[in-house]
Design a protein with these regions (language model features):
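FIC/Doc superfamily catalytic core
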Residues: 1-123
Length: 123
């Protein structure tokens, strides 16, 4: 099940994951993440499937600085919450969190690379 999330949803996940920490520096990044996961080109979803959509969200939120300090933590939390809301299996532990954070820190990071990491979260 693909879940269509909005800005309020991302901000709520950010509030919870950032433990009240994230001061938002750029709302435009979160708005762009929402629109990116919904992207359609010639009648086809640009990001097909829940892992690709979660990856588009995490890539946008984790690669572009939009919060004062909690960008990676929130990107991980948004990806996980999106997968769970979509009914996809997604087991989270320190190893999996670290793998996603490592991927997001790479200069060569792509949404496809993030999706590959997220697929490894399947239980």
């Amino acid at each position: 099940v693909n879940v269509d999330i909005d800005l309020a949803w991302i901000l709520e996940v950010a509030r919870r994951a950032g433990q009240g920490d994230p001061a938002i520096d750029d709302y435009g990044v979160a708005v762009a993440a929402v629109e990116r996961h919904r992207a359609v080109l010639v009648g086809q979803d640009v990001y097909q499937g829940v892992y690709a959509k979660a990856a588009a969200l995490a890539h946008s939120l984790g690669r572009m600085r939009w919060l004062e300090r909690s960008n990676l933590r929130v990107a991980v939390a948004v990806a996980h919450a999106y997968l769970i809301a979509s009914g996809a299996p997604a087991k989270l532990d320190q190893r999996r969190v670290s793998a996603l954070a490592t991927e997001l820190r790479k200069e060569s990071c792509t949404a496809a690379g993030v999706a590959e990491v997220l697929r490894s979260w399947a239980v």
